[in-house]
Design a protein with these regions (language model features):
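Topogenic membrane-insertion module of multi-pass membrane proteins
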Residues: 1-52, 168-201
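Helix-coil boundary and interhelical linker segments in multi-pass alpha-helical membrane proteins
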Residues: 24-39, 78, 82-103, 143-158, ...
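C-terminal ends of transmembrane helices
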Residues: 53-61, 110-124, 167-177
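"…together with the soluble PPM/PP2C metallo-phosphatase catalytic core" -> "…together
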Residues: 3-15, 22-26, 34, 39, ...
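Multi-pass membrane catalytic core of lipid/isoprenoid biosynthesis enzymes
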Residues: 11-16, 57-112
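Hydrophobic alpha-helical transmembrane segments
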Residues: 15-26, 44-52, 75-85, 103-108, ...
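Hydrophobic core segments of alpha-helical transmembrane domains in multi-pass membrane proteins
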Residues: 37-44, 99-107, 155-166, 185-188
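C-terminal membrane-associated helical module and adjoining short loops/tails
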Residues: 125-202
Length: 202
């Protein structure tokens, strides 16, 4: 009999790493270390990008598969719904309209996650996502941080970025699921963004 609940094997290790990076990133953001906080968001994105691919290569029971799906969704909530909002607040975006945009963003993110979970339970064989996957928030928010740092308009670009991303979460558009070389391309983009954050981030 196991002493602890859950599963702790290579099929979920990246998901746990993503959760840990999100919590660390929020702590760094609230401590004013924005560059390192944003780098943690890059880690969250990379972890979520590849965790499913690794999990599918592992031999798992049905219970382990379901557990993986659930913790992946919960991790996405922390990493790509709450974490970007904390980054925005830590940048000083705390006026009433910033808060309103942040609330809309979180609601859109959880709506997108809920829709994905229902769709996945019905069919996992589709070749397209409906609505922007929340993982892409990492690329968008990090890009906004870089642009804002270069142009000194972070207080403007971040709320706009969150609003547009929120709309894309719930907009009924089809987005092809990444496969093959797309994973390599997204990985290279993540590396490029991380390097840019290091050199131009505040």
């Amino acid at each position: 009999m196991k002493m602890f609940l859950g599963y702790y094997n290579k099929s979920v290790i990246l998901t746990y790493i993503g959760s840990a990076a999100a919590v660390l990133g929020m702590a760094l953001a609230l401590s004013g270390k924005m560059k390192y906080a944003v780098l943690c968001l890059v880690v969250c994105g990379v972890a979520d990008l590849f965790d499913g691919m690794i999990a599918r290569r592992c031999k798992r029971t049905e219970e382990e598969k379901e557990f993986g799906i659930q913790i992946d969704s919960l991790t996405d909530m922390v990493s790509f719904a709450v974490f970007p909002v904390v980054i925005s607040f830590a940048m000083g975006n705390t006026s009433w309209y910033h808060i309103a945009i942040s609330v809309f963003y979180v609601l859109a993110a959880i709506t997108r996650l809920g829709f994905f979970n229902v769709s996945a339970s019905i069919s996992s064989e589709t070749k397209f996502y409906t609505g922007l996957p929340v993982t892409f928030a990492s690329l968008i928010v990090v890009s906004a941080f870089i642009a804002g740092s270069i142009l000194s308009i972070t207080e403007i670009i971040m709320p706009v970025c969150l609003f547009v991303t929120a709309v894309l979460f719930i907009l009924k558009i089809k987005i092809a699921k990444p496969k093959g070389i797309a994973y390599l391309l997204l990985g290279l983009i993540a590396i490029a963004l991380a390097v840019a954050v290091i050199f131009v981030g505040g």
